[in-house]
């Protein structure tokens, strides 16, 4: 009686294939796709004859019935049909036509798309700086007085504005002080000090000192003229000399 082989030829091929897969797993290396394809061969081919299936598998050209869906990895991922092409897609049929960057799945344009997307959509932070120091013009208008309240004329006398509210004219005239009564009280505080209570009395005091000084000069000039008027005129001196 002839001894029978415990395994058939197809079973022996499957055992060798499983041994190779085990070696890859023991070495902690990725398993080649063709070994996984051999394991799934019974589900892909008909079980009519093992010889015909093996001959069709080991043929140099595969039948067109088997597409890229046959080469599946262990985690269910399909092998890329164009491995050198960028994998950026819109989720449907469109795919980027540029070549992938070395050691990357995407091109240079789509490599950092996800990282920069969140930061680019954020609006820039707005910085609010409190305006503590106001302009001199706005501060003067709010306080209700101007610097030219006392205007000095070319002759030396001081001209003050009085009466009802007046508008600024082209000739340099000043506003009336009644504007302060019409406007509500607006105080300007800078670091705990009130500009109205500190600056306005100082300015008025300087204007009053200037006016007193000009008045003294004017009175001195008048006294000098009166002293000269007491002397006899030249006509009277001539007449007296002729009379003698």
UniProtKB/Swiss-Prot annotation:
Give the Gene Ontology MF terms in alphabetical order: ATP binding
InterPro entries linked: Gln-Leu-Gln_QLQ, GRF, WRC_dom
Tissue specificity of this protein: Strongly expressed in actively growing and developing tissues, such as roots, upper stems, and shoot tips containing the shoot apical meristem (SAM) and flower buds. Also expressed in mature flowers, but weakly expressed in mature stems and leaves.
GO terms under biological process? DNA-templated transcription; leaf development; regulation of DNA-templated transcription
Task: Identify the stretch(es) annotated as Disordered.
Answer: 107-133
Question: What residue spans carry the Basic residues bias annotation?
Answer: 110-120
Record's subcellular location: Nucleus
- Could you tell me which residue ranges the WRC domain spans? 80-124
Q: What's the protein called, per UniProt?
A: Growth-regulating factor 6
Biological source species:
Arabidopsis thaliana
Instruction: Please state the gene responsible for encoding this protein.
Output: GRF6
